[in-house]
Amino acid sequence: MSVQVVSAAAAAKVPEVELKDLSPSEAEPQLGLSAAAVGAMVPPAGGGDPEAPAPAPAAERPPAPGPGSGPTAALSPAAGKVPQASAMKRSDPHHQHQRHRDGGEALVSPDGTVTEAPRTVKKQIQFADQKQEFNKRPTKIGRRSLSRSISQSSTDSYSSAASYTDSSDDETSPRDKQQKNSKGSSDFCVKNIKQAEFGRREIEIAEQEMPALMALRKRAQGEKPLAGAKIVGCTHITAQTAVLMETLGALGAQCRWAACNIYSTLNEVAAALAESGFPVFAWKGESEDDFWWCIDRCVNVEGWQPNMILDDGGDLTHWIYKKYPNMFKKIKGIVEESVTGVHRLYQLSKAGKLCVPAMNVNDSVTKQKFDNLYCCRESILDGLKRTTDMMFGGKQVVVCGYGEVGKGCCAALKAMGSIVYVTEIDPICALQACMDGFRLVKLNEVIRQVDIVITCTGNKNVVTREHLDRMKNSCIVCNMGHSNTEIDVASLRTPELTWERVRSQVDHVIWPDGKRIVLLAEGRLLNLSCSTVPTFVLSITATTQALALIELYNAPEGRYKQDVYLLPKKMDEYVASLHLPTFDAHLTELTDEQAKYLGLNKNGPFKPNYYRY
């Protein structure tokens, strides 16, 4: 009889371990280990690093027998004392082993007392063929159980709750479920409403790192500047977004929300929002059809029509233009966060089709110089490490695009010892890259030699099938821009190429000659699909979004035309000032004479609109 003791999580990474019953004479010379030592070599089920099992602490190891410490003391039949396995395996002239009739062993002490020894099974560790054992597994695997068996899902590791609250074996689409929150409402669609408690913990943790939004809640307790606002949102649904949504609710707004990315939703957070009464329609792993269905459920509601739009990527705005253009008669404005969405707004404006004012949050100072730079500088490493476990030192990396996102990625990888190349179309950004110590190249020049390719452009087909064909074996390909169009993933879905899902959000695309590339998040946004982002930095962006909504909603008629605007400089400075107390920072104040000399108001704004930070 053989018993497999390797956990499912470790099965794909280490050879299978097979334990066989052996006779005492066979076990002693082949193993010679105590039970504690054997236990230390076997990976624990469901946790730990299966490739590097830690030895038992010294305090837990059985002491090695020495002079004067024979097995007599260890095997004495004292009440409540369990003999040590290492001592039991040694023979001693003062003790004799006797067989019981039922096959058990007895210990005979010098005074003739017979004590039944605890029964043990001698085990020999043998290594089975990994490939053979893995192939014995059932071929039908749940949608996410394979990723769990290979590695703890990186994308579900935002919280400890995710690992034991996710319904990984439940193949039922959330659209087919009948769920209600504790108040009896069913106006939502999430993965599992029972995850709400764990999502609430995530939100409460995020609140501690989002001081400006919490300050807005306190300052607006009486006036409710968004009273009457009906906001429809399409953003990443994370704990940070939940804090923003609840802040908007505290300011008087009604909200309905969908996700702007099919992989970035935190299921437990979506459940917590639904439990709190927010109509949320999102879950991790939506299909393309699910994505548009969720957006439509937010917009197409009997007896409820939005008058404000908060978008990230422009998909929500596009859907309303396409399906419900008459809604814009009551919509006061659009707030757009991403470079992709802003680009689409400018296209509408240029074509004369933008029928409401729009606020460009992406190009505000507080978004560009903080979220785009500092957020990406930290999260690029987090996303790559969680999905690939790779070492960055000495790796050759090409970063496509040297805007604020590209700058953050390059700085992080350079600091970790990577050799970084940059591609860029803008001579100003290109010169910045050169002055920062990066070599400016065309992608074709380095595509055969680099270990990692990262896109940060907001453009389409930056990495084409030709580039993918020329990449070296095991090259990692990922995207830090908003859209999934930067990498031509569609060109890889052909019969001659094999796709192999090796862990959550990690695919190996295999060529006929055996070459493979490692594609992360199917070309979608790496950091929000595969890891997480710094909450404090997102607090800056979320506060900017909230103030932009307040500004557009309360602006007198005629202040904003049917065009795209930047947030007023005074509001940028206000957002920054709300975050300074976290660092115990103290601003210097201008004297009247200094303010007059500079031609400034003592309370700001301190820079003209044309100033580049």
Swiss-Prot record:
InterPro entries: Adenosylhomocyst_ase-like_sf, Adenosylhomocysteinase-like, Ado_hCys_hydrolase_NAD-bd, NAD(P)-bd_dom_sf, S-Ado-L-homoCys_hydrolase_CS. Residues 52-68 have a biased composition (Pro residues). Residues 137-146 have a biased composition (Basic residues). Substrate binds at T238, D312, E337, K367, D371. Residues 1-14, 35-44, 70-80, 147-166 have a biased composition (Low complexity). It catalyses: S-adenosyl-L-homocysteine + H2O = L-homocysteine + adenosine. Highly expressed in cerebrum, cerebellum and kidney. Also expressed in thymus, spleen, testis, ovary and, at lower, levels in lung and liver (at protein level). In cerebellum, expressed in interneurons. Residues 2-111 are annotated as: LISN domain, inhibits interaction with ITPR1. Transmembrane segments: none annotated. Phosphorylated during neuronal differentiation at the LISN domain. GO terms for biological process: one-carbon metabolic process. NCBIfam families: ahcY (TIGR00936), PRK05476.2-3 (NF004005). This is Putative adenosylhomocysteinase 3. The gene is Ahcyl2.
